[in-house]
């Protein structure tokens, strides 16, 4: 009985899916007064020999939200359900919908649609990354590099978890401002020419900023070891201060400054300050 029910449910699912595709295929072109054209990068690895292309979609701005992600969702729901992209929070927090819109790396969920209907908006996946499908880049290398910096607090003194807090003064905590807010969207790294050509060795702006976040943390005891892993000509020093990373960051952070601080620590121009003593009444 259960097997038969499963088979029926699967059949209904296939029928529903087929109806959805048929409806999308016959969707009428929008006829409103404010029709915006989007050219979207398309690539399907399941089509042998198929080459990437730009496909045009028209959207009625009077029946769509104000953000580019709203337009993408509308296109997927009403025109072409095969259009593939990442998205989650829809409010600039998760970093999932990072892509190249009108020539700039940004988040689709916080990028306003250009209201000039005479101009076509072109949308590509993040540049210089392998493309899985359409607007979905392969982030495996990026996340592997992030894991390589060991992005967690490391203590050399024995502590009993839950026994007490790790003290950090207000001034010490302020050094982390503008660092921990990074959402790992990779907009900055994908905008960096040095990362384009040396991604296998150069860690890139996003990962280096996260590395500095742990290096400078007064509670962390492994700054020397963290810096030692970057004592080569590529990990950090391939940054040529082009500043694309800072310009494109959707969170308005400054990866270039963090990389500069790492370089000064590596060359002994600076040293990490000793942590302030824990107050007696803490």
Curated annotation (Swiss-Prot):
Query: Which UniProt keywords are given for this protein, alphabetically ordered?
Result: 2Fe-2S, 3Fe-4S, 4Fe-4S, Iron, Iron-sulfur, Membrane, Metal-binding, Mitochondrion, Mitochondrion inner membrane, Oxidoreductase, Transit peptide, Tricarboxylic acid cycle
Q: In what residue span(s) does the 2Fe-2S ferredoxin-type domain sit?
A: 39-129
Transit sequence range: 1-21
Q: Name one GO cellular component term.
A: mitochondrial inner membrane
PROSITE patterns xrefs: 2FE2S_FER_1 (PS00197), 2FE2S_FER_2 (PS51085), 4FE4S_FER_1 (PS00198), 4FE4S_FER_2 (PS51379)
Q: Does the keyword Nucleotidyltransferase apply?
A: no
Expression (tissue specificity): Expressed in adult muscles (at protein level).
SUPFAM superfamilies, per the entry? 2Fe-2S ferredoxin-like, alpha-helical ferredoxin
Q: Which CDD domains match?
A: fer2 (cd00207)
The catalytic activity, as recorded, is: a ubiquinone + succinate = a ubiquinol + fumarate; a rhodoquinone + succinate = a rhodoquinol + fumarate
| Family as reported in the entry's similarity comment | Belongs to the succinate dehydrogenase/fumarate reductase iron-sulfur protein family.
Name of the protein: Succinate dehydrogenase [ubiquinone] iron-sulfur subunit, mitochondrial
